[in-house]
Every structure is written in C-alpha cells, then in structure tokens.
C-alpha cells in the first residue's frame, strides 16, 4: 500500500466539559515498516467494523469547512502537514463543544490501494498491557488498541474528484444504539448519509430471490448461486469495497454473465451499479434446505419468521406467499381432478 502522506496529532480531552489541549506534530511521519503495518492493521479493523454509513460531503460552509481544506491540499495550495493541522484544530474545537467526547491520537493518512487514492482519518486510543523487557523483567506497556476503533472515516479521493454525482465516496463509523458521541466527528468531516447500506443490501437480496424464483432453478443450483452471491458480497465487505452488480452477475451465472444484471435493470429495483455491502444483512442470507420422502424444501434464512414459520412443538412448517410457479402447478392439479 503506497503511503503518500501520514501524520499523527494528539488531543488531550476528558468527557467532562474541560478544555481540550492540542499537541500538533509539525512534520509528516517518515516512511517505515512500522507505519505501513499500522495502516494495514487500521484498514483491516476499519473494514471489519459493522454499522458503517456511506455518504457524501455537505455543502462547504463555515460549519462544514473540511471539504474546502481538503480540496485546497489536493490542488497543491497547502501541504499535507498544514492541511492536517488546520483540520485537527477544527476537530479540537468541536470536541470542546461535545461533553461526550474524549481525546486521543488523531491519524491522517493519504494512501493508495490499486488505482484508488484514499484519505483515512481515525481517532486512536491506547490500552494498557504488559511486556517482557530485554532484562527479562515484566513491565507495563501501552499499545494502540485498534479493536476499540469507534471514530474513523475513509474518503475515496478518486471517486470524489472524478464522480461528483456519487453519494457514497465517504464511509464512516456510526454510533451504536442511537448514541450521539460520534455526531461531532461526522460534523468535523462535514458528511451526510447518501446511501442506506442495509436497505440497499436488502433490495439486492430481494432482487436475487426474485431472480431465483423466475428462473425456476433446481435446489442445488439455487444454493450454489446463493453461495456465490454471499461469498462475493462478504469479501467486498471485508475489503471495504462496494458490490459491483455487473461483476456479481458474472459470478452468479458464468454462462449468462449478464442475466442477473439485466433482471435488476428490467425490474427497476432502483439499485446503483455499485452498492455498499452491509455485513449484518448478509449474515442473515443463508439457505435452509431439507429433503425426505419425496419432499424437497429450500428457502433463504432471512425469510424465517416472516414468510416461513417453524413450529418445533408441532413439527410443522408454514409457508406464506407461495411461489407463483408452485401455486400455478397446484391450481392446475386441483382443476384437473
């Protein structure tokens, strides 16, 4: 991962309304293996976080100046250290206005993955641990705790600069359970949600279910295509990358690589060519299958509790909204009697 620029500042702040103290670094961090390892681990931790939101910058204003500063840096009007210093001073001000906020090390990293450039911003915290010294003594030691990554954002700079119509070039970690602790960080970036990742993922899965039903696939083939979808989407989520519908379509059916893509377009599900995956929604999309004595049943796990009800006590399975093709067969059989 080529690292263009990276710097770390420190904001000391307690969540009690007390003033924040900024310790700003004057120069960028030098390239090193330790720095590269840190960014790789940070990326992995960030990609693994559930509950991220995807969006875009607010209109630049006095309340949301960050995008203007970032644009000036990218155009060469100021260097990376000066840009980060201006940004972290703004973050410090917002921290002081939020009684819920606490300080930490603020990392800014401009790096490249493949052909895409990113800016990552994260508030890092330490955890207490222990180490064994060179003299074989046990001593306390601090380390960056990336498992406790709660405030971070990643901006796809290439997407922002080349596709101003995009509504998903920023991803950021949302607060859990309605907590407002992350609001000041979102205001610092100056971003708003542009894409509902869980909703988009649910729509994709609905489109896939409709596709499988319309194709009247055999049980084994339906299971294979479901696995192909879930495996690809889960991999994209792990990489922090979007689901590309045309690429997914080719993986689902190699002989007819555009069949699923054309199904989505013809039925007008309203999906963008690329959508952000939601891991929690994907985890619910597995198939239950069973076969015995001339009976074969297969359905997606997310339907359990809605269209499919299982009564363990009476050993019964109730199916609502019977598939249209099965319904037609049953009606023809009934009419023929």
Swiss-Prot record:
Signal peptide: none annotated. One of its GO terms (cellular component) is cytoplasm. One of its GO terms (molecular function) is single-stranded RNA binding. The keyword Cytoplasm applies. Keywords: Cytoplasm. Disulfide bonds: none annotated. It is found in: Cytoplasm, Nucleoid. It comes from the Bacteria. InterPro entries: Nucleoid_associated_NdpA. The keyword Cytoplasm applies. Belongs to the YejK family. PANTHER family: NUCLEOID-ASSOCIATED PROTEIN YEJK, PTHR38772. This is Nucleoid-associated protein Avin_11450. The lineage of its organism: Bacteria, Pseudomonadati, Pseudomonadota, Gammaproteobacteria, Pseudomonadales.
């Amino acid at each position: 991962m080529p690292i263009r620029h990276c710097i770390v500042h420190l904001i000391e702040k307690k969540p009690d309304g007390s003033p924040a103290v900024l310790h700003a670094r004057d120069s960028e961090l030098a390239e090193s293996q330790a720095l590269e390892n840190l960014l790789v681990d940070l990326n992995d931790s960030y990609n693994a976080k559930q509950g991220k939101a995807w969006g875009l910058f607010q209109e630049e204003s006095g309340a949301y100046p960050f995008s203007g500063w970032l644009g000036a840096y990218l155009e060469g009007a100021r260097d990376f250290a000066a840009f980060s210093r201006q940004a972290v001073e703004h973050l410090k001000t917002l921290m002081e206005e939020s009684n819920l906020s606490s300080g930490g090390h603020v990392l800014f990293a401009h790096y490249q993955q493949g052909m895409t450039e990113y800016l990552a911003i994260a508030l890092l915290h330490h955890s207490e641990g222990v180490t064994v010294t060179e003299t074989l003594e046990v001593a306390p030691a601090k380390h960056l705790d990336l498992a406790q990554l709660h405030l971070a954002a990643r901006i796809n700079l290439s997407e922002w600069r080349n596709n101003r119509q995009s509504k998903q070039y920023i991803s950021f970690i949302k607060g859990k359970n309605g907590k407002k602790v992350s609001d000041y960080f979102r205001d610092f970036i100056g971003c708003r949600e542009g894409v509902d990742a869980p909703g988009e993922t649910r729509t994709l899965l609905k489109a896939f279910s409709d596709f499988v039903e319309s194709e009247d696939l055999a049980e084994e083939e339906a299971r294979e295509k479901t696995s192909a979808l879930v495996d690809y989407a889960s991999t994209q989520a792990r990489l922090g990358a979007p689901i590309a519908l045309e690429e997914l379509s080719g993986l689902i059916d190699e002989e007819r690589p555009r069949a699923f893509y054309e199904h989505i377009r013809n039925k007008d599900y309203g999906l963008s060519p690329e959508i952000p995956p939601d891991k929690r929604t994907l985890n619910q999309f597995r198939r239950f299958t069973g076969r015995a004595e001339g009976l074969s049943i297969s359905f997606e796990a997310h339907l359990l509790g809605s269209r499919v009800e299982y009564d363990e006590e009476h050993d019964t399975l109730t199916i609502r909204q019977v598939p249209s093709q099965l319904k037609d067969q049953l009606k023809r059989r009934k009419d023929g009697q």
